[in-house]
């Protein structure tokens, strides 16, 4: 009996501690000329919203509208008790992408992009020295400065699920 109570207590504790915060997923959609879009989706449950955020959803909407950098556009939606804010970083070339990313990060990004389509080399090489979490630092900063969240590390707020690369629609 003690073992069952202990296991139940352990399971209950894990469930309480597993509040995920904001699930962040990202897709970089590229064309051969390096034009494209980086799409970053932030999804959170109502429970996580009330656990992390000291304000209403209207406050959050207003904060995002006022704080969203010029390089980004965004949409928001709600479904099944989850809210999603999707941010779009559109770019026309590698130089345009680097400039917009530099403005978001406040440092010069290192981005490696090579594409080969010949009998000797075929494929894509893509590397960057930052994550979507880094690109969303502006939102964390705005939330903290507006006193909507405590100064926990941003790693406690963001849960980066994945970043995918889509090249030529594949």
Sequence positions of predicted segments:
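Post-signal-peptide N-terminal segment of Sec-exported extracytoplasmic proteins
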Residues: 43-72, 128-139, 143
């Amino acid at each position: 009996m003690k073992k069952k109570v202990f296991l139940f207590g352990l399971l209950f504790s894990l469930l309480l501690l597993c509040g995920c915060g904001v699930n962040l997923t990202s897709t970089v959609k590229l064309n051969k000329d390096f034009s494209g879009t980086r799409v970053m989706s932030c999804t959170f449950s109502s429970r996580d919203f009330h656990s992390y955020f000291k304000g209403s959803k209207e406050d959050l909407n207003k904060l995002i509208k006022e704080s969203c950098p010029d390089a980004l556009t965004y949409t928001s939606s709600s479904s099944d008790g989850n809210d999603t804010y999707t941010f779009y970083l559109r770019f026309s070339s590698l130089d345009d992408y680097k400039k917009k990313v530099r403005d978001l990060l406040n440092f010069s990004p290192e981005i490696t992009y090579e594409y080969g389509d010949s009998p000797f080399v075929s494929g894509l090489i893509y590397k960057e020295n930052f994550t979507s979490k880094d690109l969303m630092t502006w939102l964390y900063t705005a939330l903290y400065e507006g006193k909507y969240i405590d100064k926990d590390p941003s790693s406690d707020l963001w849960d980066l699920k994945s970043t995918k690369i889509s090249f030529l629609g594949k």
